[in-house]
């Protein structure tokens, strides 16, 4: 009996290890599709994102991300209202509603919004490579799901509490491993949060980045808007 239990424990360990390997294989293949030369870690580029929303004027954002230089800049223009946030190493500059410019550090609560923007855009436009970041917990099980009639390999990701609390799912084309959909939930309740449908591709510094992102509510498929990437 002891031998059987020991062998069962060994078999269980092998199965779990195999599942984990499969999940990371899918992620590695997805990264191989989007960033075949490993350029993300040294990414330095500028691009424009036009956000189209129902019944609202478009918001045009010009974004600069320089990972080696630890630099981020976001300038937005919506209906003639212009704002900017800039972070360089530990220094932070941003414009207030009245147009005045504040210079401070990233530890200042006033810069919280600027840090949020930096993390937001670096995360979204750095996927799926960002799923290798510390604090990211990749579920070892690869799910097979249908989404809007198409088959996908789905990876579930959670984060250490210090990183984030949302639960994410990433949908990859089973043939090419291109990332085509992702969604997040605010809790185990899958009616919370949003899903994002990706379409088109743009090559930026050797990285294949989804061109358009259409955002919807999970609860009722309500349409929120579409981010459209523009490369000058």
Regions found by a protein language model. Give the residues of each.
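Bacterial Sec-dependent N-terminal signal peptides
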Residues: 1-23
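Catalytic loop of the DD-peptidase/beta-lactamase superfamily, centered on the K-T-G motif
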Residues: 83-94, 104-111, 223-232
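N-terminal mature ectodomain segment of secretory-pathway/periplasmic proteins
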Residues: 31-101, 135-136, 141-143
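Intrinsically disordered, low-complexity segments enriched in polar/charged residues with Gly/Pro
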Residues: 50-52, 60-61, 71-73, 78-81, ...
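Gly/Pro-enriched, hydrophobic low-complexity segments
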Residues: 146-232
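Short flexible/disordered coil segments
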Residues: 59, 99-118, 200-220
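Flexible, processing/modification-adjacent segments and terminal tails
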Residues: 20-26, 94-166, 189-192
């Amino acid at each position: 009996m002891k031998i059987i239990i020991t062998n069962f424990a060994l078999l269980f360990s092998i199965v779990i290890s195999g599942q984990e390997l499969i999940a990371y294989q899918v992620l590695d293949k997805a990264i191989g599709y989007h960033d075949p030369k490993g350029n993300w870690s040294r990414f330095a580029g500028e691009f424009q994102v036009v956000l189209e929303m129902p019944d609202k004027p478009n918001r045009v954002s010009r974004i600069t991300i320089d990972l080696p230089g630890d630099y981020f800049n976001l300038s937005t223009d919506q209906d003639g209202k212009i704002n900017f946030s800039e972070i360089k190493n530990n220094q932070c500059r941003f414009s207030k509603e009245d147009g005045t410019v504040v210079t401070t550090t990233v530890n200042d609560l006033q810069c919280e919004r600027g840090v949020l923007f930096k993390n937001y855009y670096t995360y979204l436009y750095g996927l799926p490579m960002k799923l290798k970041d510390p604090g990211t917990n990749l579920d070892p099980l690869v799910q097979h799901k249908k989404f809007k009639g198409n088959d996908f390999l789905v990876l579930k990701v959670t984060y250490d509490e210090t990183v984030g609390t949302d639960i994410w799912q990433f949908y990859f084309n089973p043939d090419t491993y291109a990332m085509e959909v992702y969604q997040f939930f605010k809790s185990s309740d899958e009616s919370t949060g949003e899903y994002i449908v990706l379409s088109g591709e743009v090559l930026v510094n050797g990285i294949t980045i989804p061109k358009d992102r259409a955002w919807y509510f999970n609860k009722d498929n309500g349409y929120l808007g579409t981010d459209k990437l523009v490369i000058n």
